[in-house]
Amino acid sequence: MAKISVLVAVYNTEKYLHQCLDSLINQTFDDIEIICINDASTDCSLKILQTYAKKDNRVKVLEMPLNSGSAKARNAGLRLATGDFIAFVDSDDWVSNNAFEQIYNTFIS
């Protein structure tokens, strides 16, 4: 079980997705699971997610059959989450490489 489950709802963000996922897999705190919920993207987002999942076993991909919006996608991801803590990152954003280390240390102190 991961300490932190990071949920990323994805819809047509292929332009930004590499930077987002790179920022997550390169965290200084690596006891995370990265749950990416593809919300029926019509671009190459799903292919990008699958590539990252093959490279890093912390990356999990969930496919929504229909575009349902970020709230439903996040709720679907929550059902798969095993972490003690939950974090949300937008798929067109990225985080600093020590973000989750700082967050975790703050929570446990």
Model-derived features: where do they sit?
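Nucleotide-sugar donor-binding/catalytic module of glycosyltransferases
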Residues: 1-109
